[in-house]
């Protein structure tokens, strides 16, 4: 099995609900290590740049507005098959379709306010991690 890194964001609605510890506990119980983390308030440019691939989609403006509506917690997770494992822990993008016990089923408010972001591939993970973290900020253990 491959040791991978993936990016995770606890979105503004989950930060506001004060469920960061619950979410972190799920990462760790699944065997993922948190090797970098920062809380920040994204501005329009930073959020828009991160979600650049969605710029032409009709939901882009709403997505940027939501992601800038409050602080987010951004972390790098590391472990065996971290990308797929994190996506499994998160659950389906639409919380109505998410399995019981997943982060989105338990903490999302809607499709657009779905509590967490996770990289969808190792390529995306590398790009997304570099967007928010310098190599010196990541501490593999």
Curated annotation (Swiss-Prot):
Question: One GO molecular function term?
Answer: metal ion binding
Compartmental location? Cytoplasm
| Cofactor(s) listed in the protein's UniProt record | Mg(2+)
UniProt keywords (A-Z) are: ATP-binding, Cytoplasm, Kinase, Magnesium, Metal-binding, Nucleotide metabolism, Nucleotide-binding, Phosphoprotein, Transferase
Report the main location listed first in the record: cytoplasm
What is one process in the GO biological process aspect for this record?
Answer: CTP biosynthetic process
**Keyword Magnesium carried by entry:** yes
Q: Does the keyword Calcium apply?
A: no
Its EC number(s): 2.7.4.6
Pfam families under this entry?
NDK
- GO cellular component labels: cytoplasm
Query: What catalytic reaction does the record list?
Result: a 2'-deoxyribonucleoside 5'-diphosphate + ATP = a 2'-deoxyribonucleoside 5'-triphosphate + ADP; a ribonucleoside 5'-diphosphate + ATP = a ribonucleoside 5'-triphosphate + ADP
Say which family it is in. Belongs to the NDK family.
Instruction: Give the record's subunit note.
Output: Homotetramer.
Name under which the protein is recorded: Nucleoside diphosphate kinase
Q: What is the lineage of its organism?
A: Bacteria, Pseudomonadati, Pseudomonadota, Gammaproteobacteria, Cellvibrionales
């Amino acid at each position: 099995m491959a040791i991978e890194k993936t990016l995770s964001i606890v979105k503004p609605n989950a930060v506001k609900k004060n469920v960061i510890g619950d979410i972190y506990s799920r990462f760790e119980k699944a065997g993922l290590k948190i090797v970098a983390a920062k809380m920040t308030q994204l501005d329009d440019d930073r959020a828009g740049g991160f979600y650049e691939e969605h710029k032409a989609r009709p939901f882009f403006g709403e997505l940027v507005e939501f992601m800038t509506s409050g602080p987010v917690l951004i972390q790098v997770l590391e472990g065996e098959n971290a990308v797929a494992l994190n996506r499994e822990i998160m659950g389906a993008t639409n919380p109505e379709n998410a399995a019981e016990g997943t982060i989105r089923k338990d903490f999302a408010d809607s499709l657009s306010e779905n509590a967490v972001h996770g990289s969808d591939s190792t390529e995306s993970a590398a790009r997304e991690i570099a967007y928010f973290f310098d190599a010196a900020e990541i501490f593999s253990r």
